[in-house]
Regions:
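Short alpha-helical segments enriched in small residues
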Residues: 1-162
Length: 162
């Protein structure tokens, strides 16, 4: 899976560099893996300036300015929270592209309605924010890797379609 992460990161780098885009990330369940995959590319400072790892609800509210009431009402792992993570980090950092992830990597923390492996990814630009729901299988690390891969793929797709 590391090879796929590296391939998608390089593709994101090339896509952003070609279009002169600055990307920022807001991560929860990946714990910085997404940002790490981007900065592993030489020259990444040309396209990447910042990242937030907001693992707790308090930090999502404080750092990303997501109303705590919204998080409590919908849960941190929800489409609306992922959407707000992408939207708010995009605006706060004055970036061209944002990638946000929130999910349940396990092995605990899941429920019947929100099982381990549930992840929401949101990718934002000035014009639109796309959200996508995923269900991944595997251990904690595998879920985090799959989330990183799919977040990068979605970001690449959004860039290439615009």
């Amino acid at each position: 899976m590391w090879k796929k992460i590296n391939q998608e990161s390089k593709k994101l780098f090339d896509n952003c560099l070609k279009r002169n885009l600055i990307v920022t990330t807001a991560e929860s369940c990946t714990g910085g893996m997404l940002a790490s995959s981007i900065v592993s590319i030489s020259g990444s400072s040309n396209i990447f300036h910042s990242s937030f790892v907001t693992y707790s609800n308090e930090m999502k509210s404080k750092m990303l300015e997501i109303p705590i009431e919204l998080i409590i009402k919908n849960g941190a792992v929800s489409e609306i929270v992922a959407y707000n993570m992408a939207s708010n980090v995009l605006n706060l950092m004055k970036a061209d592209l944002s990638i946000a992830v929130t999910g349940i990597a396990g092995p605990g923390g899941g429920s019947e309605s929100k099982p381990v492996g549930l992840v929401w990814v949101a990718v934002g630009t000035i014009k639109k924010i796309i959200t996508k729901k995923y269900f991944f299988k595997g251990n904690r690390l595998e879920i985090r890797k799959e989330t990183t891969i799919e977040a990068l793929k979605l970001a690449n797709r959004i860039i290439e379609e615009s």
